[in-house]
């Protein structure tokens, strides 16, 4: 009788343990699914912000390019125009990453483009980037 009781209790403990392991696995898989969904949402928001930022930068670069395209240009303005065209190509490459290798063959990279900006351009871009940053912070506060 004691042997049957020990076997029954052992079986009960084993089945309870198996059920708890199964429940743990299910809760982990549900947690993984929820984490994956939240990561997708975060990536979606990040992608939307990135595309908005790219659009704003493209618009700014196009506006500056049009400004320098009208009328006579000095040598300095011509150099600025060439740099803006390079920046536009880099912004376009963000939309089409498969063309990034082609960009490298033309010897354009982020560090070189960053070094091309003169102090005058930094004075122009600084306040613009500050305004964009403030706008993004305002949007994030409204969203959050």
UniProtKB/Swiss-Prot annotation:
Cited InterPro entries: Bombinin (IPR007962)
Tissues expressing this chain: Expressed by the skin glands.
Transmembrane segments: none
Alphabetic keyword roster: Amidation, Amphibian defense peptide, Antibiotic, Antimicrobial, Cleavage on pair of basic residues, Fungicide, Pharmaceutical, Secreted, Signal
Residues annotated as signal peptide: 1-18
Propeptide feature ranges: 19-43, 74-123
Positions bearing Isoleucine amide: 143
Keyword Magnesium tagged: no
The keyword Acetylation is annotated on this UniProt entry: no
Modified residues (Asparagine amide): 70
Biological process, per Gene Ontology: defense response to bacterium; defense response to fungus; killing of cells of another organism
Subcellular location: Secreted
Gene Ontology, cellular component aspect: extracellular region
Record family assignment: Belongs to the bombinin family.
Note: BLP-7 is also encoded by another gene from the same species (AC A0A219CM62).
Stated name of the protein: Bombinins BLP-7/GH-2
């Amino acid at each position: 009788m004691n042997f049957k009781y020990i076997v029954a209790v052992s079986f009960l403990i084993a089945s309870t343990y198996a059920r708890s392991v199964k429940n743990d696995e299910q809760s982990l898989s549900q947690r993984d699914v929820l984490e994956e969904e939240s990561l997708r949402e975060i990536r979606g928001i990040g992608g939307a912000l990135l595309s908005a930022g790219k659009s704003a930068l493209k618009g700014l670069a196009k506006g500056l390019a049009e400004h320098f395209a009208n009328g006579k240009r000095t040598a300095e303005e011509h150099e600025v125009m060439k740099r803006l065209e390079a920046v536009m190509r880099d912004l376009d490459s963000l939309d089409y990453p498969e063309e990034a290798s082609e960009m490298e063959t033309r010897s354009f990279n982020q560090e070189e483009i960053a070094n091309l900006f003169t102090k005058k351009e930094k004075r122009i871009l600084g306040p613009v980037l500050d305004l964009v940053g403030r706008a993004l912070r305002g949007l994030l506060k409204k969203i959050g």
